[in-house]
Amino acid sequence: METIHVDLAERSYPISIGAELFCNPAHFSSVIPAKKRVVVISNVTVAPLYAQQIIDTLNTFECQVSLLELDDGEQYKNLDTFNQILTFLLEENHSRDVTIVALGGGVVGDVVGFASACYQRGVDFIQIPTTLLSQVDSSVGGKTAINHPLGKNMVGAFYQPKAVIIDINCLKTLPEREFAAGMAEVIKYGIIVDREFFDWLDENMDKLYALDHDALIYAISRCCQIKADVVAKDEKESGMRALLNLGHTFGHAIEAEMGYGNWLHGEAVSAGTVMAAVTAQKEGLISQSDVERICSILEKAKLPLKAPKEMTVDAFMKHMMRDKKVLSGKLRLVLPTSIGSSEVVTGVSESVLAEVIEQCKA
């Protein structure tokens, strides 16, 4: 098992990464006191697979546990689901000493984290991510949010969990399409800051898709370590944390325009990463060979390289100008400058962006 620490002074917390963690009380009792009231919140897909294991483990130190199952899908990461959680907590008369466990993928983690941040001005919560994407990205760092019809993650808060518990055995029940979506975020880390990790991924893609234990532990641990280091330096995304959004400005536009859930987040990020790389090449920031390597590894990971053909330039620009990185009306893009290096760029012209969008559509 690997343990990584997110260093945020009094709000620091551990990330535990291994196998068979759900049945080990030690991973829970270190952050949840005995006899505590606990609410496990999952979705209708994940709860039947893993909720009872966790409830049984919590019962070993006499926690009082209740379970809430949410609908499954990005389209449910909304105000209605947020209110459903708050209503459940109120109807069960939970006070500020409750601990909430978010069991599921990125949607569950985001909406449950946001509800935890808001309920009685903040209660403890633990992230138990069950998808590759949530294990390497969304469960770590304290970003919580729900979507708005006009934009993704537009309503939310920075709110850190008390712990993150990652059991790689969950990936055995994950559909390959979802695994591939997670690989988009894994590859992102190599592109933005770690060329050596990028090279390792390129060489070990088959092992990862075969769910090789050691390969998964290494890849997930490396992603979490990179993110933990970035978050420790820039928790509220005032500087370098923005680099973690490579591909997301274009990608969020795809998700919003095509309807949440029709394109998986990682699929949209993959197409968005290609668009960012092509933009960087047109701006003279990255070599053609590095762009080709980025496209090659995404294709090897069974991810889309092209944006949907029906999306117009106007549709992209409408959504991109609502991006949270926009400052003073100016679009800021995370662009790779080489494999292992990236920067935030302001001032890419609309004509260049229009060229990129047309070039990168299916």
Curated annotation (Swiss-Prot):
Q: What class of enzyme is it?
A: lyase
Q: Does the keyword Cell cycle apply?
A: no
* The protein's required cofactors: Co(2+); Zn(2+); NAD(+)
Q: Which SUPFAM superfamilies match?
A: Dehydroquinate synthase-like
- Gene Ontology cellular-component annotations: cytoplasm
Alphabetical keyword list: Amino-acid biosynthesis, Aromatic amino acid biosynthesis, Cobalt, Cytoplasm, Lyase, Metal-binding, NAD, Nucleotide-binding, Zinc
One Gene Ontology term from the biological process aspect of the record:
aromatic amino acid family biosynthetic process
Q: What is its EC number?
A: 4.2.3.4
Q: Which residues are recorded as binding Zn(2+)? A: E185, H248, H265
Q: To which pathway does this protein belong?
A: Metabolic intermediate biosynthesis; chorismate biosynthesis; chorismate from D-erythrose 4-phosphate and phosphoenolpyruvate: step 2/7
Q: Where in the cell is it found?
A: Cytoplasm
Q: Does the keyword Metal-binding apply?
A: yes
Q: Which reaction does it catalyse?
A: 7-phospho-2-dehydro-3-deoxy-D-arabino-heptonate = 3-dehydroquinate + phosphate
Offer an example of a GO molecular function term for this protein: 3-dehydroquinate synthase activity
> Which InterPro entries does this one have?
Dehydroquinate_synthase, DHQ_synth_AroB, DHQ_synth_fam, DHQS/DOIS_N, DHQS_C
Concerning CDD domains, the annotation shows: DHQS
Q: How is the cofactor bound?
A: Binds 1 divalent metal cation per subunit. Can use either Co(2+) or Zn(2+).
Task: Briefly state the protein's biological role.
Answer: Catalyzes the conversion of 3-deoxy-D-arabino-heptulosonate 7-phosphate (DAHP) to dehydroquinate (DHQ).
Family note: Belongs to the sugar phosphate cyclases superfamily. Dehydroquinate synthase family.
**Could you identify this protein by its name?**
3-dehydroquinate synthase
